[in-house]
């Protein structure tokens, strides 16, 4: 398994390409589908067979329709069964997907939205909007922040130190770095609710 990062200038966000030994590939959070991303896929002779969405904000998924035209036999996996006007295979916390023989664990990360999830495979955590290097994901109110922080403490900060965190925004990091950087002693207190 190989992981590639593509930075979309128009959204200032990351899309990830996971290349499998079979020649098939997974795209994660395709905010845009431009020539550079197409070149990355084609250069490695990958065929995109699955798209994983960590959230369903339409403004973050502009590349989705184009990808579906280029790679017609693609399935979309997301927490919600409908993304814009496209059908997705719904996934939920604790589920393990089998994508071309590659196990992908689904981790629920509600907070930014109720439909936010992360995907863990091969020591890489694709966490979407839940976490960025050095900061928690953006939320709309203290209750959402408390929910997000509790989920991060229970589901993400318990992963092995060397787990690589690949966020929607910002550079990669690791669980060890974020555990040292971000205070997690009391999610309710951090959210301003205690």
What feature does the model see in each segment?
Residues 1-44, 117-128:
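Conserved beta-strand hairpin/beta-sheet module of binuclear metal-dependent hydrolase folds
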Residues 6, 91, 109:
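Hydrophobic residues at beta-strand termini and immediately following loops
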Residues 12, 25, 32-105, 181-188:
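Active-site HxH/HxHxD metal-binding segment of metal-dependent hydrolases
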Residues 28, 76-78, 127, 167:
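Hydrophobic residues in well-ordered beta-strands that form the structural core
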Residues 51-61, 107-114, 166-172:
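Histidine-centered catalytic micro-motifs
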Residues 95-96, 102-118, 131:
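Pocket-forming structural segment of enzyme catalytic cores
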Residues 114-194:
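Metallo-beta-lactamase
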């Amino acid at each position: 398994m190989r992981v590639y990062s593509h930075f979309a200038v128009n959204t200032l966000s990351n899309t990830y390409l996971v290349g499998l030994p079979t020649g098939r590939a997974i795209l994660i959070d395709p905010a845009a589908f431009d020539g550079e991303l197409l070149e990355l896929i084609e250069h490695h002779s990958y065929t995109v067979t699955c798209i994983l969405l960590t959230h369903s904000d339409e403004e973050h998924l502009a590349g989705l329709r184009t990808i579906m035209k280029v790679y017609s036999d693609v399935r979309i996996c997301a927490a919600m069964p409908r993304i814009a006007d496209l059908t997705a295979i719904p996934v939920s916390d604790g589920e393990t997907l089998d994508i071309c023989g590659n196990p992908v664990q689904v981790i629920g990360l509600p907070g930014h939205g109720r439909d936010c999830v992360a995907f863990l495979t091969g020591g890489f955590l694709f966490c979407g909007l839940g976490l960025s290097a050095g900061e928690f994901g953006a939320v709309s109110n203290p209750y959402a922040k408390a929910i997000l922080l509790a989920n991060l403490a229970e589901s993400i900060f318990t992963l092995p130190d060397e787990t690589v965190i690949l966020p929607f925004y910002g550079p990669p990091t690791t669980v060890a770095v974020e555990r040292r950087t971000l205070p997690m002693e009391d999610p309710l207190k951090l959210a301003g609710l205690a």
